[in-house]
């Protein structure tokens, strides 16, 4: 199904918990800064995803909080795995990934994105308020070993991390990961000074790239290949390309459909109607109707 702007819905991002075992100073918790309603069950998530198939969803991204904190995560993946879903991926901080990678693969998970903003153990502990970077690296190694690939490393470009980019690039090249450089969205005024314009970084990488590809169904995002390393950029801020080619809707952990990454004022309740026995397809239609580009030309 297309929205009013001709954008086909293809992807569904599921935030399955607000909880996290780290406390990164920049975290916006997928746009939900407070714990609100009841956590959805694995069965409810499965039913909502199943309804989304009618509207064109073929890719699922699972996130949080930290999704590996949900002990029923393999069950959730099993519920949503079917022949119509072409790709199920998960974004994690990687702390628990070594322990659960094989179970997730067995349940039907295809691949993972692991957040990693620095390779410096001291800086990592400072950014995450106590995280152990060695646990993350072991988790990445295990994920690659069991076949949760292509693995992507999510690098958040901030004033305090950009100096780590060359080392991160070398690390990703060495382990065979794709590097995703993400623009920092400051959700609070006191964090604005951490924002870094990633356009010059992208221009520099584009200049030195061996090959450049365009991902048509991912906001026309460019993929650069430089010395064997694949690099992508995610630039949501003031980016008309990002918005005009967006194919994703989102589900909050407490059961609200979220039409836009950058808005939290037009959520559509779907969990409570489901619990009341309603046909939830009309709520998907409402969500898709609410979609409009946040950044317009």
From Swiss-Prot:
It catalyses: GTP + AH2 + S-adenosyl-L-methionine = (8S)-3',8-cyclo-7,8-dihydroguanosine 5'-triphosphate + 5'-deoxyadenosine + L-methionine + A + H(+). One of its GO terms (molecular function) is GTP 3',8'-cyclase activity. Its cofactor is [4Fe-4S] cluster. Gene3D superfamilies: Aldolase class I. SMART domains: Elp3. It comes from the Archaea. Its EC number is 4.1.99.22. The keyword Iron applies. It is an enzyme of class 4 (lyase). This is Probable GTP 3',8-cyclase. It comes from Methanococcus maripaludis (strain DSM 14266 / JCM 13030 / NBRC 101832 / S2 / LL).
């Amino acid at each position: 199904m297309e929205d009013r702007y001709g954008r086909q819905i293809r992807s569904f991002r599921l935030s399955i918990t607000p909880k996290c075992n780290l406390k990164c100073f920049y975290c916006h918790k997928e746009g939900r800064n407070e714990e609100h309603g009841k956590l959805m069950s694995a069965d409810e998530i499965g039913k909502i995803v199943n309804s989304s198939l009618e509207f064109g969803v073929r890719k699922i991204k699972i996130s949080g909080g930290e999704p590996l904190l949900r002990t029923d995560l393999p069950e959730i993946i099993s519920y949503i795995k079917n022949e119509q879903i072409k790709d199920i991926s998960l974004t994690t901080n990687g702390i628990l990934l070594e322990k659960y990678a094989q179970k997730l693969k067995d349940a039907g998970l295809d691949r993972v994105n692991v957040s990693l903003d620095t390779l410096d153990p001291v800086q990592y502990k400072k950014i995450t308020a106590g995280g152990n970077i060695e646990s993350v690296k072991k988790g990445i190694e295990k994920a690659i070993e069991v076949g949760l690939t292509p693995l992507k490393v999510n690098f958040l470009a901030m004033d305090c991390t950009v100096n780590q980019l060359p080392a991160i690039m070398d690390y990703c090249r060495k382990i065979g990961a794709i590097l995703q450089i993400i623009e920092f969205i400051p959700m609070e005024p006191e964090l604005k000074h951490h924002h870094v314009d990633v356009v010059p970084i992208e221009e520099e990488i584009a200049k030195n790239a061996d090959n450049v590809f365009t991902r048509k169904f991912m906001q026309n995002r460019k993929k650069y290949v430089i010395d064997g390393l694949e690099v992508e950029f995610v630039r949501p801020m003031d980016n008309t390309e990002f918005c005009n080619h967006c194919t994703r809707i989102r589900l909050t952990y407490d059961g609200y459909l979220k039409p836009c990454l950058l808005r939290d004022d037009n959520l559509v309740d779907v969990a409570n109607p489901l619990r009341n026995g309603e046909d939830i397809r009309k709520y998907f239609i409402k969500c898709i109707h609410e979609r409009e580009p946040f950044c317009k030309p």
